[in-house]
Amino acid sequence: DPPDPDRFYGMM
């Protein structure tokens, strides 16, 4: 499953 958008973009 793909990572949560909030957590994924939060790491960027």
Swiss-Prot record:
Entry keyword annotation includes Coiled coil: no
Main location: secreted
Keywords annotated in UniProt: Amidation, Amphibian defense peptide, Neuropeptide, Secreted
PROSITE patterns: TACHYKININ (PS00267)
GO CC annotation terms, alphabetical: extracellular region
InterPro entries reported in the protein's UniProt record: Tachy_Neuro_lke_CS (IPR013055)
Entry comment describing in which tissues the protein is expressed: Expressed by the skin glands.
Modified residues annotated as Methionine amide in this record: M12
Example GO BP: neuropeptide signaling pathway
Superkingdom of the organism of origin: Eukaryota
Compartmental location: Secreted
The family this protein is said to belong to: Belongs to the tachykinin family.
Function: Tachykinins are active peptides which excite neurons, evoke behavioral responses, are potent vasodilators and secretagogues, and contract (directly or indirectly) many smooth muscles.
Protein name: Hylambatin
Native organism: Phlyctimantis maculatus (Red-legged running frog)
Lineage, opening ranks: Eukaryota, Metazoa, Chordata, Craniata, Vertebrata
